[in-house]
């Protein structure tokens, strides 16, 4: 399988405005995979010895898990990207290198994303959670639903209100880079070179034993663990370089809207089209002022250029995200038994979005009407969120239903577009 999949970005002061950290990710997956946006509340687990069912394996549960909002392929337990109630955001990428990928079922990188969010209240603690689980349970297993086998190692971009971490893995070996200012992005290649803040204790010795490092030159993680001919990975390296250029183009003035425009960029390949396409997108505002709420925007639909970024804010008693939640099927039946039957996982928003796109694809006038209405809704939402951040006022009663109501407003645009008459 060719290395097509995802781009994740972070921008920190002084690259951003208003002392905010901005996180963004495009999830690039198979064209027919549905991604849902779901919320799970915080839970105290009183049952000592409780076991947790992840996508393929069971692991030990912890005494307490935090509230999380996730954007995830609807067939699995983990997530491609998400955030928790403490302002921690994580996105993962598929990476390949010299260390052989294991098809044996273990924790998926997407499981590790969710576990990091559920168990950590800072970015570095999330890194600790992930590397500890990686050591204990390993990573591996098919990352797609159905007959096709698609396995990979993972890199992660983890951010909170104060800093970001890049964590890149090769089997059980890993390196981590701390990011405290400026911009950083990851794609489908190892990108940590000599700036290593933390690492697996045997990472260098293993590379030396394998003949990947002579023990004399300054250790370069990407050079040691990447394929000999990384030039063959032109697609991922191209997107990585293009993403870096786009971030630096706006350096000093990056806002959440800037990040959305980067995710919508098609010439760079960041907004991907084809067999693998951008199935969902996420952008988060993480104010360094802890009195301000973190705001997380999700699309829940393919192609951010033709989707609406809808805001989510953590408050008590969040309304269920029914319109972006897929029908439930037993993982035991469909994943554990390796069923080749792919059920219809389309949630209400996805269904209306796809129906509307089918209508407008061959009708430029309808397409313009729909897109104009989508951007109008988005701009209204952006103004409301900016007002919350500037005025430091949060109407909790309204916020509990914020994301569900935005989703209903988006669905109404698609329904109206399906019935609107245009001039001949």
Swiss-Prot record:
InterPro entries noted in UniProt: Peptidase_C69 (IPR005322)
Propeptide span(s): 1-5
Pfam families from the UniProt entry: Peptidase_C69
Sites bearing Pyruvic acid (Cys), chain numbering: 6
Molecular functions (GO terms): cysteine-type exopeptidase activity; dipeptidase activity
Keyword annotations from UniProtKB, A to Z: Pyruvate
Active site (catalytic residues): 6
Biological process per Gene Ontology, one example term: detection of temperature stimulus involved in sensory perception of pain
Top-level taxonomic group: Eukaryota
Residue numbers of Glyoxylic acid (Cys) PTMs: 6
Described purpose of this protein according to its UniProt entry: Plays a role in thermal nociception.
Family, similarity comment: Belongs to the peptidase C69 family. Secernin subfamily.
The protein, known as: Secernin-3
UniProt source species: Homo sapiens (Human)
